[in-house]
């Protein structure tokens, strides 16, 4: 915050709150509400405004916890409640000696924004500071990723063992969730389990479809693991023992793409250089490639990521003017599926950037049958 000349921040993003305070309450619900927030001065300890019913939970961790104001369910009275909240923000800034300073905010709805305007509190963007703070992992975070890497390997092992003809996609998703929760993971934030034709194009979530003999079965774990840190690895399995030549080809394309990105991971390489040197998919697979080749991971799917430099589909993605740094955590991913084909392959590795190159967070192996 000091680097960006931000004296004080108001944080509503659940991952930012957890990073600043170490607390997390009912993450799925609070992520979609404005029920809890914190004020973080550049100098001094954060003040957590907790959902009123959960104040006792956070007081075990944070010294200064106060009941949160919320207007979200106030109907026609919401604007008045938001003004009351804005006055409390003004009072807290005055208490901190920061009443006349700019307030850096991560997210807010229109009602809250207008209420702060009414109080003449100047608002600026906090994103550059939170990205820089969370991008390079601390030694404690690196240890948590090591713990979660082992959890990721275990849950994928149970998932693979459950694949059989007749099991439904949503049942496989349940296997993944159960395996995660039994190891003190916190939950899955997508349902990306699919089989057969549902693997092409990618991003079809779990359905009632039964897995058939010879199907490819794809999974992206997309999991909040122990202490909320991301377990994000993709694998594609075969239901059976005899892949077709076409299945092997798609698997090899995705595998070689991810392995080629491994070779580029080192501190100091710019995002632009990485994107320029990364493997290109064969033309037959390019139309349905994954939107980005790399994203970051922490307490959530994090950015900035690395897009394909030649992507002309839809709004052009920004190529961040950044470089890889030691102790960043990256997810290197590739989808290989031809348009109209009855299958596709999604592979993704999660790696820690070290001075010697990438270190796997999850070491779950690739399928030797599909690589043969």
Give the predicted meaning of each segment.
Residues 1-372:
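Active-site neighborhoods and metal-handling regions in enzymes and metal-associated proteins
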């Amino acid at each position: 915050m000091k680097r960006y000349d931000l004296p004080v921040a108001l944080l509503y993003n659940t991952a930012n709150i957890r990073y600043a305070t170490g607390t997390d309450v009912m993450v799925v619900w609070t992520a979609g509400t404005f029920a809890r927030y914190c004020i973080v001065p550049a100098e001094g300890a954060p003040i957590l405004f907790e959902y009123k019913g959960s104040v006792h939970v956070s007081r075990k961790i944070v010294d200064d916890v106060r009941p949160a104001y919320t207007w979200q369910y106030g109907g026609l009275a919401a604007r008045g409640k938001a003004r009351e909240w804005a006055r409390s923000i003004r009072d807290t800034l005055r208490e901190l000696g920061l009443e006349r300073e700019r307030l850096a905010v991560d997210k807010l709805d229109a009602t809250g924004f207008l209420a702060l305007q009414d109080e003449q509190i100047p608002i600026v963007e906090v994103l550059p500071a939170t990205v820089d703070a969370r991008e390079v992992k601390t030694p404690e975070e690196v240890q948590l990723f090591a713990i979660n890497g082992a959890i990721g390997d275990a849950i994928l092992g149970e998932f693979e063992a459950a694949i059989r003809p007749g099991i439904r996609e949503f049942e496989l998703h349940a296997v993944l969730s159960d395996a995660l929760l039994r190891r003190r993971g916190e939950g899955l934030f997508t349902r990306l389990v699919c089989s057969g034709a549902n693997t092409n194009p990618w991003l079809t979530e779990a359905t009632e479809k039964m897995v058939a003999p010879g199907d490819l079965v794809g999974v992206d774990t997309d999991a909040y693991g122990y202490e909320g840190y991301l377990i994000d690895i993709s694998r594609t399995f075969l239901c059976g023992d005899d892949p077709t030549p076409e299945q092997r080809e798609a698997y090899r394309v995705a595998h070689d793409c991810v392995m080629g990105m491994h070779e580029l991971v080192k501190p100091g390489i710019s995002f632009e250089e990485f994107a320029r040197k990364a493997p290109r998919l064969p033309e037959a697979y390019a139309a349905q490639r994954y939107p980005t080749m790399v994203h970051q991971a922490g307490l959530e799917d994090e950015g900035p990521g690395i897009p394909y430099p030649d992507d002309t589909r839809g709004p052009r993605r920004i190529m961040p003017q950044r470089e890889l740094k030691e102790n960043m955590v990256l997810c290197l991913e590739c989808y290989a599926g031809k348009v109209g084909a009855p299958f596709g392959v999604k592979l993704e590795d999660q790696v820690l950037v070290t001075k010697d190159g990438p270190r796997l967070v999850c070491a779950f192996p690739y399928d030797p049958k599909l690589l043969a």
